[in-house]
């Protein structure tokens, strides 16, 4: 490819709309352009990167025995109604009607469609197991699209679905996909960790997320420094912290003007934060759920939803709170209205251990002190509903844990029979009895993997692509297009690299050398061959983008040298 023919409109200034490195650099490098909120066009360089990621995925899917299909983006509403997810999925689902008033959605995922696709075709246990996968656009109407490709309304996803005769078979399929995903992300050259995860709206109770570790990640991950345990913080179950014994006092009401937050209490009343008991209230499908945690802890809303059930989780309104005797800013179980089917109180196990603590009185400007929840909170439900912190220990081995950020680039789910039962998708077993398929599903965010790679691998000059996913593996850069000797050597090297199957770009633009160097660093080609004044002496410069290593190499044999260098870098996943 010649740079003079390449459509790659680079930008000199940082785009104001970009909040994270991947978004900024893909716009600057001429890989991506925004069309509307959460909607992007991939330009040739960006599309090449996506295709390289897709080809790595395709190779490993074929190796695993999965078979590629393609299903429609537009899906009929009735199959989503069969599983009950038409209303459950919420406003993130794009819904539409055709001219005949039939309802459809733009697929956010394809569990329903794939299950209906096989339910009348796979009839016998002899046809199983089967794993079908596709590379397809997905659509989710994000309330706040942001961070470029990391949270967009349209994205490319690889999704696979396995069908087995029993749970043992499903676990085997799950492990096959888990191993394939590990190979995929290793070859893509990103630092990742598989972590235990919640299944969310997909369902099932067996799941791992593949997290690309990056500061820009929206997910919090806990990792044990001793045994290697790793989990999404929503899935990690912290231990109950036991408070030290002390003499108990009777709870007493006291005035706390302008103390509507935990921080206000700490600063004005001078109470230690671990002695405060914080209230967070949710509206879950119209049910009021009051949760209580220690003041320095955060509520795990996923754990709360898993305990209570329901689909639509919102912050409770002041009107709903007051209808149940709760005063916003001063809430607690004390003086609250009676619990019933529409009102439940959940207290975290660690909060229940507090002695002589401070919590709200459900009266504006007042709190109770010397509160001991185990004694004073009546008829409440207790459970572990807080997020793990670095002050906790590993739930597996008791070792030290660290929190870090991650970008979810893939997830594997053991679905069980959730979809096959609701969609009446069955096969005949060895005894001729109808049984529901035991399913798994497995997703990789292709475009998100591209963004995650940049989040991990960039510097102040631009992107640092691994060889496996770079838009071009190497660039030949003649510094002066008016010097015939330089141009002749550059074209010769370019042709030799093409003959060696190197994916190479010749920067034949009539631009200053500095402009070409800046663009090469911005776009992030792994290897740069600079053809300059020493070309007449039979020498060119070879530079590795990742390490900034430079070396002068004789022109004779330089193409073979670069090809070997690229092979070595790729073997090391660099």
What are these regions (language model features)?
Residues 1-98, 110, 161-200, 297:
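TRNA-binding/sensing appendages of the translation machinery
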Residues 75-79, 320-321, 508-515:
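Short acidic loop-to-helix transition motifs that present clustered carboxylates
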Residues 87-104, 212-223:
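Acidic, His- and aromatic-enriched active-site or binding-groove loops in soluble protein domains
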Residues 99-133:
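Hydrophobic alpha-helical hairpins/lids featuring a short glycine-rich hinge
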Residues 111-119, 144-158, 168-442, 446:
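Extended, low-hydrophobicity, polar/charged segments
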Residues 265, 440-468, 473:
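C-terminal, non-catalytic macromolecule-binding modules
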Residues 462-516:
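Generic long, charged, amphipathic alpha-helical segments
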Residues 493-561:
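C-terminal structured "cap/appendage" subdomains that terminate the fold
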């Amino acid at each position: 490819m010649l740079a003079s023919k390449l459509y790659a409109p680079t930008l000199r200034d940082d785009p104001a709309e970009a909040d994270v490195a991947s978004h900024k650099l893909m716009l600057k490098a001429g890989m991506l352009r925004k069309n509307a909120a959460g909607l992007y066009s991939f330009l040739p360089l960006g599309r090449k990167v996506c295709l390289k990621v897709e080809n790595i995925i395709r190779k490993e899917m074929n190796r695993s025995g999965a078979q590629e299909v393609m299903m429609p983006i537009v899906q009929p509403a009735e199959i989503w109604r069969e599983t009950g997810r038409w209303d459950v999925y919420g406003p993130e689902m794009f819904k539409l009607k055709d001219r005949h008033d039939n309802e459809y959605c733009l697929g956010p995922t394809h569990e329903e469609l794939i299950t209906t696709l096989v339910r009348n075709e796979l009839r016998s246990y002899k046809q199983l197991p089967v794993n079908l996968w596709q590379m397809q656009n997905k659509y989710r109407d994000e309330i706040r699209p942001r961070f470029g490709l990391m949270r967009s309304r349209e994205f490319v996803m690889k999704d696979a679905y396995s069908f087995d005769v029993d749970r043992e078979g499903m676990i085997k399929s799950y492990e096959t996909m888990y191993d394939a995903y590990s190979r995929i992300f290793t070859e893509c050259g990103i630092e990742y960790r598989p972590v235990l995860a919640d299944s969310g709206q997909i369902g099932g109770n067996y799941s791992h997320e593949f997290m690309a570790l990056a500061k820009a990640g929206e997910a919090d991950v806990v990792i044990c420094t001793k045994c290697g345990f790793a989990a999404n913080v929503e899935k990690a179950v912290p231990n109950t912290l036991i408070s030290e014994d002390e003499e108990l006092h009777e709870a007493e009401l006291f005035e706390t003007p302008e103390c509507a937050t935990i921080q206000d209490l700490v600063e004005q009343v001078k109470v230690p934060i671990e002695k405060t008991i914080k209230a967070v209230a949710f509206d879950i499908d119209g049910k009021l759920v009051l949760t209580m945690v220690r003041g320095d802890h955060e509520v795990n809303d996923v754990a709360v939803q898993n305990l209570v059930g329901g689909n639509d989780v919102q912050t409770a309104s002041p009107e709903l709170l007051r209808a149940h005797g709760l005063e916003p800013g001063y809430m607690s179980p004390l003086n609250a209205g009676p619990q019933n089917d529409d009102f439940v109180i959940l207290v975290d196990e660690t909060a229940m251990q507090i002695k002589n603590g401070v919590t709200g009185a459900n009266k504006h400007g007042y709190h109770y002190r010397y509160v001991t929840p185990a004694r004073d909170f009546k008829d409440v439900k207790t459970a572990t509903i807080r997020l793990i912190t670095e002050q906790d220990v590993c739930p597996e081995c008791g070792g030290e844990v660290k929190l870090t950020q991650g970008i979810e680039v893939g997830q594997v789910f053991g679905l069980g029979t959730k979809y096959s039962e609701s969609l009446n998708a069955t096969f005949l077993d060895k005894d001729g009895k109808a049984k529901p398929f035991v399913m798994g599903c497995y997703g990789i965010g292709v475009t998100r993997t591209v963004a995650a790679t940049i989040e991990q691998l960039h510097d102040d000059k631009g992107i640092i692509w691994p060889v496996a996913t770079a838009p071009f593996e190497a660039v030949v850069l003649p510094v002066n297009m008016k010097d015939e000797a330089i141009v002749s050597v550059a074209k010769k090297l370019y042709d030799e690299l093409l003959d060696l199957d190197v994916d190479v770009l010749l920067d034949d633009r009539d631009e200053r050398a500095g402009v070409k160097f800046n663009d090469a660093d911005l776009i992030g080609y792994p290897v740069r061959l600079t053809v300059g004044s020493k070309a007449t002496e039979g020498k060119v410069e070879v530079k590795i983008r990742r390490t900034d290593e430079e070396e002068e190499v004789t022109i004779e044999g330089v193409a073979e040298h670069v090809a070997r260098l690229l092979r070595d870098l790729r073997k090391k996943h660099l």
